[in-house]
Amino acid sequence: MTEYKLVVVGAGGVGKSALTIQLIQNHFVDEYDPTIEDSYRKQVVIDGETCLLDILDTAGQEEYSAMRDQYMRTGEGFLLVFAVNSAKSFEDIGTYREQIKRVKDAEEVPMVLVGNKCDLPSWNVQNEQAREVAKQYGIPYIETSAKTRMGVDDAFYTLVREIRKDKDNKGRKGRKLNKPNRRFKCKML
């Protein structure tokens, strides 16, 4: 069974823990208790393949930023979560993305942009803004509500598909690099 190491990142209070707990335990946690770091595991079937999701729910608070490099090194894919009612959390996404790329030393890392709290009546980040940023980054955008469970499975499953796509692409490039060059001519004497 394939295991996927997923990391949920974003500013404090955007609903990272609520999304993760909704996926793992099918219930909504409405009290806010800042996370330092929690790890969850769940077996799921995605596109006919049984796999194990190893999900790291991270601290959004700035005082825990020193821990980020470590979990970014071990993660295979990242959910970049912002709250649609917080323009600041949306602006912070770029910082998380750049830090992930720096730590992973890669231009392309599997990521999904997630706009959470879509059940709220007023949004400070419009759908079009988020779609435009996701398009610039070349990553999918999923709207979620941890409260109503809207888009929760979709966000995590889309990230697994992005990791698979990334592995396939790297595998193809690796095979091309390993092919010996057989363009030599022989002459019979």
From Swiss-Prot:
GO cellular component: membrane; plasma membrane
Propeptide residues, chain positions: 187-189
Gene Ontology MF terms in the entry: G protein activity; GTP binding
GO-annotated biological processes: signal transduction
SUPFAM superfamilies listed in its UniProt record: P-loop containing nucleoside triphosphate hydrolases (SSF52540)
PANTHER family: RAS, DI-RAS, AND RHEB FAMILY MEMBERS OF SMALL GTPASE SUPERFAMILY
Family listed: Belongs to the small GTPase superfamily. Ras family.
Protein name, UniProt field: Ras-like protein 1
Source organism (scientific name): Drosophila willistoni
Lineage of producing organism: Eukaryota, Metazoa, Ecdysozoa, Arthropoda, Hexapoda
Gene: Ras85D
